[in-house]
Curated annotation (Swiss-Prot):
Compartments, as annotated in UniProt: Virion; Host cytoplasm
InterPro entries per record: SOD-like_Cu/Zn_dom_sf
Keyword rRNA-binding: no
Family statement: Belongs to the Cu-Zn superoxide dismutase family.
Biological function: Superoxide dismutase-like protein with no enzymatic activity.
Cystine residue pairs: 52-102
Protein name (database record): Cu-Zn superoxide dismutase-like protein OPG175
Keywords from the named record: Disulfide bond, Host cytoplasm, Virion
Annotated GO biological process: superoxide metabolic process
Cleaved signal peptide residues: none
One GO MF term: metal ion binding
Length: 125
């Protein structure tokens, strides 16, 4: 299992890469974006020393996520990515080829308990 923590200004989230019933899934949630469609992309380097400028070229398109009117995206995507090959690389959230937020993909402890996703209600709480 792998995890990427996104913490870039108002944009925050947790994205997990994990096998579920024999298929690899991308699960998580992101808050702080405007309503619309965004892309999840794996990049060559896990170097975020200069923000998303230093993560290198895009390598793998994971899929699109939709942010609702409350600024929340719930992520549940299938992927063919071999999880062991993406450890140490970066994941970006992009729109129109602009990298809005990114984080490094790391190894995560496998926990059989329920994953609590970030949630927000209509009052912004």
């Amino acid at each position: 299992m792998a995890v990427c923590i996104i913490d870039h200004g108002n944009i925050r989230g947790v994205i997990y890469f994990e096998p579920v019933h024999g298929k690899d899934k991308v699960l998580g949630s992101v808050i702080g974006l405007k309503s619309g469609t965004y892309s999840l992309i794996i990049h060559r380097y896990g170097d975020i020393s200069r923000g998303c400028e230093s993560i290198g070229s895009p390598e793998i398109f994971i899929g699109n996520i939709f942010v609702n009117r409350y600024g929340v995206a719930y992520v549940y995507l299938d992927t063919d990515v071999n999880i062991s090959t993406i450890i140490g690389k970066a994941l970006s959230i992009s729109k129109n080829d602009q990298r809005l937020a990114c984080g490094v993909i790391g190894i995560s402890f496998i926990n059989e308990k329920i994953i609590h996703f970030l949630t927000i209600n209509e009052n912004g709480v």
